[in-house]
């Protein structure tokens, strides 16, 4: 899976300012015909425990064609809570 914010490829463990990720990213992945996928984006470092920022279900060949079970919310960690990781997971 590849994640792009503003057409820029984001590498694993790459630091982004929250302002650079306020809009839905583009997700590219190899897919198989006749299979459905689910995409999760979450912040395991939230002060309230694991917090989901985006859930898309019933994805066929493009995330844009899936159903938003949870609308995208960009990163906005509270001040003085350290660096937060935002993890994308794709399930068949």
Q: Predicted regions span which residues?
A:
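N-terminus-centered regions that define maturation/targeting leaders and the start
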Residues: 1-92
């Amino acid at each position: 899976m590849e994640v792009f914010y503003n057409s820029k490829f984001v590498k694993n463990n790459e630091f982004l300012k929250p302002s650079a990720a306020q809009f839905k990213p583009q997700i590219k992945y190899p897919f198989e015909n006749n299979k459905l996928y689910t995409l999760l984006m979450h912040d395991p470092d939230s002060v309230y425990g694991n917090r989901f920022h985006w859930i898309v279900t019933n994805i066929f060949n493009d995330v844009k064609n899936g159903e938003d079970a949870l609308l995208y919310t960009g990163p906005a960690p509270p001040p003085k809570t350290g660096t937060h990781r935002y993890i994308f997971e794709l399930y068949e």
